Amino acid sequence: MQAPHPLDLARVNPDDFDIRCFDDELRTDELCVRLLHAVRDRLIVQGHPPQEAGELCGGADYFLRDFVIAECGDNLLRLPAERVRQFAGHWYIVRTLEPNRQELARLLAGVAACYRVLAESALVEPSRAEAIAADCADIDWYEERIEAFWAIEDDGFTAWRNACPLPPPRP
């Protein structure tokens, strides 16, 4: 199997990442892979060792493809402000066998790096990338959420869930 050809970041059309139906989701998932290859290449040019650049994009991949695209149906270039907190403070915790600070920090480092490159490429507003980076850096709060999840007793899940709710289910 041949590796996907990276997208040319200068020629990306944000509208191509809109998701209105299942076919759009499949197309967007493929575009996301190609986008992440381009981000990886840009990180390498910026001085990141290839393995580190790949690991950063791996973290962004999980967030973008499994949560933003598949779960939320969002355009990753028009990401709602609350998505990082919903991912790290809820979705990751309930979808991971053993959620932990170290793994989550690696994932979020990739998300922040990816959105920094997207901002540098004028694909997202710099203020959006900065807000995403700030949410990615709030690892102490996410660790508190993990600990609170493991401490849930009786009907405490509802209160835990309501403190950081997920977006409504897609139609």
Summary of predicted features, one role per range:
Residues 8, 12-64, 68-70:
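N-terminal "first-domain core" detector
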Residues 38-49, 63-66, 70, 94, ...:
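Surface-exposed polar/charged interaction patches
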Residues 31-34, 38, 83-87, 131:
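Exposed alpha-helical structural elements
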Residues 106-144:
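Amphipathic alpha-helical protein-interaction segments
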Residues 2-22, 131-171:
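Flexible interdomain linker/hinge and immediately adjacent N-terminus
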Residues 49-120:
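Non-catalytic DNA-binding core/recognition domains of DNA-processing enzymes
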